[in-house]
Amino acid sequence: MGQKTHPLGFRIGITRDHKSSWFSNMKSYPKLAQEDYKIRSCIEKQLHNASISLIYIDRKVDQVQVHIHTARPGIILGKMGRGLEDLRKKLETTLKNDTQIRINLIEITDPDKEATLIAEFIVQQLEKRIAFRRVIRQAMQRSQKAKNQGIKIQVSGRLNGAEIARSEWVREGRVPLQTLRAHIDYSYKTAHTIYGILGVKVWLFKGEKIITDKVDN
């Protein structure tokens, strides 16, 4: 049986960075890791329609900086910036400690270059009961317009309400999953339909990164 490696974890330290940036001793590490999980879960639950592709967490001694990469910053800001303040208070309540939280919004100018946002688009269309092949074709066209070098989409489950679940995938361009220097963006989402849950996976190939760091002998 072939073993599948997670395309993002496989490239950490080469073409990808960790989604959190902080150091801790062994005693505090589990607590801080759990806090990161709570922050991400709270943001994703409250802002599920804000087209968020990445939540990056940076910690200092008594401060947590949360960088939210979003294609729709207006939804997070709300009227007169109240939405951002409400989110900050909600996060402070969730953590239940005296840690100061600062939120920084980073706007995504081209959402079709983000695997997470393409996967979200596919999920939204599938939940509206649009035929999966048509949805995949639309996603492929959007990726082509964004000039990605390659894209692979896989949809699994009871496709179009079929009795037996199956998987179908389509690839266009190059998606070199075994090349470590390849800049691959990956996302997995689930669509909840009347026939059950459909799994959606998207791989995007954005080009190769030249690795310049050399180890001195």
Curated annotation (Swiss-Prot):
Main location, first listed in the record: plastid
Keyword Ribonucleoprotein: yes
UniProt keywords, alphabetically: Chloroplast, Plastid, Ribonucleoprotein, Ribosomal protein, RNA-binding, rRNA-binding
Record's subcellular location: Plastid, Chloroplast
Keyword rRNA-binding included in the entry's annotation: yes
Classification via PANTHER family: 30S/40S RIBOSOMAL PROTEIN S3 (PTHR11760), SMALL RIBOSOMAL SUBUNIT PROTEIN US3C (PTHR11760:SF19)
NCBIfam families according to UniProt: rpsC_bact (TIGR01009)
Subunit organization: Part of the 30S ribosomal subunit.
Protein name as it appears in the record: Small ribosomal subunit protein uS3c
Gene: rps3
